[in-house]
Amino acid sequence: MLIIPAIDIKDGKCVRLTRGDFDQQKIYLDNPRDMAIIWRKQNAKMLHVVDLDAALTGTMVNFEKIREIVATLDIPVQVGGGIRSFEDVERYLGIGVSRVVIGSAAVTNPQLIAELLATFSPSQIVVGIDAENGIPKIKGWTESSSMQDYELALEMKKLGVKRIIYTDISRDGMMQGVGYESTRRFAMKAGMRVTASGGVTSSDDLKKLQTLEQYGVDSVIVGKALYESNFPCQQLWYNYEKGMGIDCNFTTASVRGKCCF
């Protein structure tokens, strides 16, 4: 199972939210690029980057910050948050982003998904479904969809979408364990490749998710647990917190473009 570290950007800084609540945010670093380097040096094979400001406003506020991350790293970077037009997707792919995550627009403008898949590879276009009690939430989790999460997935599947990033909002940032049952239910009904997200707290959660590989769950996005050093071998992050700094010399081979999509 591929483990994908998450970097959320708000006001140009690397932050983490609790259950998507913008009033409950913690700033970890002023420069998201430094955070990206840390995760790369800890052997990340891919990064998940979200522009939180764009998720609310629909404007690519942190585009330059994301460009810096992509230009610095030698691994695939997927980007989400406020991507609501064909031009947004072109712009991100144009700077080397490996794949873009369409969230709200999949609900409000499904025709956009069809247009994107007519132009780009399904490996470059994925749909993010962030659900609470089985109901997708959109526009920075401030509005609800009228359909069930798996129903949305099946509609996307008809359009040619191959992968869903599924987030259990009730677990996101809570450090209370992964939403195993909700993810299992969704994956079984959707019948697609699924990247799980939300609530991973320990290696035990990762082991539980591995049992869902038979249903298409082949990767997981991990956020706050990494920032709170809940996993072993996180010496680099510890060193950075202590002011010891980092460098940009990667000790592992480049895997840009080689990640399994």
Curated annotation (Swiss-Prot):
Q: Which residues form the active site?
A: D8, D130
Give the Enzyme Commission number: 5.3.1.16
Any single GO CC term annotated in Swiss-Prot or TrEMBL for this entry:
cytoplasm
The disulfide bonds in this chain are: none
Q: What class of enzyme is it?
A: isomerase
Pathway listed for it is: Amino-acid biosynthesis; L-histidine biosynthesis; L-histidine from 5-phospho-alpha-D-ribose 1-diphosphate: step 4/9
Write one Gene Ontology MF term: 1-(5-phosphoribosyl)-5-[(5-phosphoribosylamino)methylideneamino]imidazole-4-carboxamide isomerase activity
* Localization per Swiss-Prot or TrEMBL: Cytoplasm
Gene Ontology BP annotations: L-histidine biosynthetic process; L-tryptophan biosynthetic process
Q: Which InterPro entries match?
A: Aldolase_TIM (IPR013785), His_biosynth (IPR006062), HisA_bact_arch (IPR006063), Isoase_HisA-like (IPR044524), Isoase_HisA-like_bact (IPR023016), RibuloseP-bd_barrel (IPR011060)
Keywords, in A-Z order: Amino-acid biosynthesis, Cytoplasm, Histidine biosynthesis, Isomerase
The yes or no answer to whether the keyword Hydrolase is present is no
**Amino-acid biosynthesis recorded as keyword:** yes
- Record's catalysed reaction(s): 1-(5-phospho-beta-D-ribosyl)-5-[(5-phospho-beta-D-ribosylamino)methylideneamino]imidazole-4-carboxamide = 5-[(5-phospho-1-deoxy-D-ribulos-1-ylimino)methylamino]-1-(5-phospho-beta-D-ribosyl)imidazole-4-carboxamide
- What family does this belong to? Belongs to the HisA/HisF family.
Protein name, please? 1-(5-phosphoribosyl)-5-[(5-phosphoribosylamino)methylideneamino] imidazole-4-carboxamide isomerase
- Organism, per UniProt? Prosthecochloris aestuarii (strain DSM 271 / SK 413)
